[in-house]
């Protein structure tokens, strides 16, 4: 498939507890997250913006597609990383040649790291109370 319909192409990305449903449609390069402009939503943070739009930069499609995202769960970092994965998957579905550009840079790798649970008898997940010999 080399083009998108008026409905667009939908893909899902996940990171930690965040889930992002990413839709790309032909347009001017605008990023919309939860019906709000993407830059203020991501608090003007360059790391979040790079994560959310990096896949478009790598494939040199920044000004050709609008990105519409519905995201929920987690924090801003998790949501930005979920958007990154969903957008990369959408671009790969758009054309197979984008996969060769995105895969070596890690855009198509799902990060499985999650918060480790707190264990009883410990203060945090791994932090133990101070040991006393006597």
UniProtKB/Swiss-Prot annotation:
Top-level taxon of the source organism: Eukaryota
One cellular-component annotation, GO: small ribosomal subunit
Renumbered residue ranges of the record's region Disordered: 105-134
UniProt-recorded name of the protein: Small ribosomal subunit protein uS9c
One GO MF term attached to the UniProt entry: structural constituent of ribosome
Pfam families according to UniProt: Ribosomal_S9
Gene giving rise to this polypeptide: rps9
Biased composition (Basic residues): 115-134
Localization annotation: Plastid, Chloroplast
Example GO BP: translation
UniProt xrefs under NCBIfam families: PRK00132.1
Annotated keywords: Chloroplast, Plastid, Ribonucleoprotein, Ribosomal protein
Family classification: Belongs to the universal ribosomal protein uS9 family.
PROSITE patterns for this protein: RIBOSOMAL_S9
UniProt main location, coarse: plastid
Secretion signal span: none
Chloroplast found in the keyword field: yes
């Amino acid at each position: 498939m080399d083009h998108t319909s008026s409905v667009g192409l939908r893909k899902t990305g996940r990171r930690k507890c965040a889930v992002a449903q990413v839709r790309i449609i032909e347009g001017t390069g605008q990023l919309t997250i939860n019906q709000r402009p993407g830059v203020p939503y991501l608090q003007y943070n360059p790391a979040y913006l790079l994560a959310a739009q990096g896949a478009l930069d790598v494939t040199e499609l920044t000004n050709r597609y609008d990105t519409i995202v519905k995201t929920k769960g987690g924090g801003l970092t998790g949501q930005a990383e979920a958007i990154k994965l969903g957008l990369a998957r959408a671009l790969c579905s758009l054309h197979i040649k984008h996969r060769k550009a995105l895969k070596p840079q890690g855009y198509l790798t799902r990060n499985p790291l999650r918060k480790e649970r707190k264990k009883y008898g410990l203060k945090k997940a791994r932090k133990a109370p101070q040991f006393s010999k006597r």
